[in-house]
A protein has these predicted regions:
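The substrate-binding groove and active-site-proximal loops of carbohydrate-active enzymes
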Residues: 16, 46-51, 120-128
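Intrinsically disordered, low-complexity acidic Ser/Thr-rich regulatory segments
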Residues: 109-135
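Histidine/acidic residue-rich metal-binding segments in metalloenzymes
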Residues: 1-18, 22-39, 52-68, 131-147
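Short acidic/histidine-rich active-site segments
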Residues: 72-74, 144-165
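Active-site loop ensemble at the mouth of alpha/beta enzyme cores that anchors a bound cofactor
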Residues: 53-55, 84-93
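Mid-to-C-terminal alpha-helical segments outside catalytic/metal-binding sites
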Residues: 139, 166-179
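Active-site beta-loop-alpha junctions enriched in small/polar residues
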Residues: 15, 20-27, 43-46, 73-77, ...
Length: 179
């Protein structure tokens, strides 16, 4: 009830309701409550990479019917369902070095970044390809049309993106994949 009140107020104020980072039940509550188009600011297709953060086909269709937009998330684990296993194996292989870095007091993610940089070829090889990201794009376009797909990247919150898409400077690679 409180959430529905908040969504109603957001609609009145012209605020966009973002359905990324919410559970499936909350997603449906939001879609059924809002009177304005929603955005999934950084989500992918569950049918291609079945992780709970990605949207199922009926959710994708609901966003399209609502007039909303789904913006692709570049996080490797939301693009390729095998990434997590490959990443864990990479971290296990280099656990001694990671542990040594952690013992110095640096933050865990920074230690992983340092090891990934040190073993660049190996760390890049476990990342998904741009083509795998494009499978999400193509799938969403087939379900709801090109006017409902955008780029969300999530560069400010991720530590791994597809090969060739490490920063915004790599967007031309994404553009080439679209052509």
């Amino acid at each position: 009830s409180f959430g529905k009140t908040i969504i109603g107020r957001m609609n009145q104020l012209g605020m966009i309701v973002d359905v990324s980072h919410i559970g499936e039940t909350t997603f449906w509550d939001a879609i059924n409550t809002t009177t304005k188009p929603v955005i999934a600011s950084h989500s992918n297709a569950y049918s291609i990479c079945p992780v709970t953060r990605n949207l199922k086909d009926d959710q994708i269709k609901a966003v399209g019917k609502n007039g909303g937009v789904i913006c692709l998330n570049f996080f490797s684990g939301f693009v390729d369902s095998n990434f997590s296993k490959k990443d864990m194996a990479f971290r296990k292989t280099h656990s001694t070095e990671i542990d040594s870095l952690l013992a110095t007091g640096i933050q865990r993610e920074y230690a992983f970044t340092m090891i990934s940089d040190k073993y660049k070829t190996e760390s890049e090889a476990i990342k998904p390809t741009i083509e795998q990201l494009m499978q999400h794009f193509d799938h969403i376009v087939k379900l709801i049309g090109i006017n409902h797909v955008g780029i969300g990247s999530d560069f400010d919150g991720i530590n791994s993106a597809p090969q060739g898409l490490s920063t915004v400077l790599d967007y031309p690679n994404f553009t080439k994949a679209l052509i």
